[in-house]
């Protein structure tokens, strides 16, 4: 299956191993890389290789130690520039060669965010982190930047000696750099084959604390205590995940808590999950982000979508496993409650994109579509809804878990397509083919909008949320006195999130209602980011001008796209806030992550910088 998001030709050759030497330079904001690729030919008379690059300067290419000619092709607006290497001799099928490439990144590499010391918690040292998913590894090193190709890697990273480097691999020691006493070299090895999007690097003033037999938490020292508290249950989650999905093959499961500009909730980099500090709620209520990233150790990292059009295979299964872990930790009613909340998230995404937008297909066509622009909760929640629906159809949670375990065993260390997944589903449930044949596969997979069927949910925990939400929707001015702090005193933070999510799917409330809500529930002071985000959106939609500064503060003080993009969009759509919103973005854009900055600029109809 051709990957529309890559120039590389995985049907002609595969990278089997990578040896990286990286030199991180904070002054020039560049990484100089010497990349050694072990390449295996998949055909006879292979005379050239095409690799993905983006904003890279290629200094030199050698094949088996001999200089090789190379040329950069035409640059594509978001795919980057193909690098064509002419081999000094043609390869036969199965033959391997070592391709060495010296390159330097651009300061505007889309995979890297360089933070100056003022943007860190410690305010003393600069900081660098990478985010390669989906198609940004090519802006660090030349590679086959497609999830269909997996390889092992070894790496040596040179950094200023007062800083520490970590990668998505096991640590393999450190040493002083011989040629420069001000620098240090950190070494890493990843012996499990991974796709390029799982290469990850962080460099900063990091400290670590062991919180379990295979988990160390890494962060700046200022965030270490709250992080250690928040993620104390990591080993318990790992054990539940192993019970559900099979043995954990990666050895170490460390967590890195990043500065606030990190664009995602978490990133499942092997051996070292990257986590947003916005989940530091102080009460462990948002730790399910960790259950999600742990689950990726099986669905995503071990069994990988072959192209980004099949992204739901990574995310739908991972959300399914995450909610099974939630069920083990907090009970089946909670799993069902989270599943229902996911359906509302899906409705939100469909409303944002539009119900006829082809990007709301479970399996979208990404030909000439930037994967970052296509990102939404659709692959997560439509994918989960399909699996949850199949669980109910095929005999319940335990029976469906048997399928999931077998699927992971069958496709471990490989990349997989939706067709292969479906074929395996049919072969596993061969005695239930008549049931499977009744599923509207076209409606689920290749049709935009909401799914053709809604699964059934246990409503025990949701009913109180629906009742309170509807009370606010139906309330007239004279009813507002009937609300009090008692309304929410028995609700968990998850239920309060759900009340606000229900209200966000309704018509905007009058300003009088949100003002009263603030009087009785004091939501402006809530620190939980998921509650705060929905509350501020509700107020902006109601047209309450007092919250404009609070919403702008949340949009700029952290950079998690799940929060930043909708807040900026809602503020832009609020006439009275528009000018201030655009000015705030223009003032802050140089401090933003490159992908976040590009997408928010698009949301605000501002041209790229």
Curated annotation (Swiss-Prot):
Compartment(s) where it occurs, according to its Swiss-Prot or TrEMBL record: Cytoplasm
pH dependence per the entry: Optimum pH is 8.5 at room temperature (with LTA4 as substrate). Optimum pH is 7.5 at room temperature (with alanine-4-nitroanilide as substrate).
SMART domains xref list: Leuk-A4-hydro_C (SM01263)
Site (Essential for epoxide hydrolase activity, but not for aminopeptidase activity): 372
A Pfam match: Leuk-A4-hydro_C
Entry annotated with the keyword Hydrolase: yes
Predominant cellular place of this UniProt entry's protein: cytoplasm
Catalytically driven reaction(s): Release of the N-terminal residue from a tripeptide
Inhibition and activation profile: The epoxide hydrolase activity is mildly restrained by suicide inactivation, possibly involving binding of LTA4 to Tyr-380.
UniProt record similarity statement: Belongs to the peptidase M1 family.
Additional free-text comment from the UniProt record: In Xenopus laevis, as well as in lower vertebrates species such as fish and insects, tyrosine at position 375 is a phenylalanine, which reduces the sensitivity of X.laevis LTA4H to suicide inactivation.
Subunit structure and binding partners: Homodimer.
Protein name according to UniProt: Leukotriene A-4 hydrolase
Record organism: Xenopus laevis (African clawed frog)
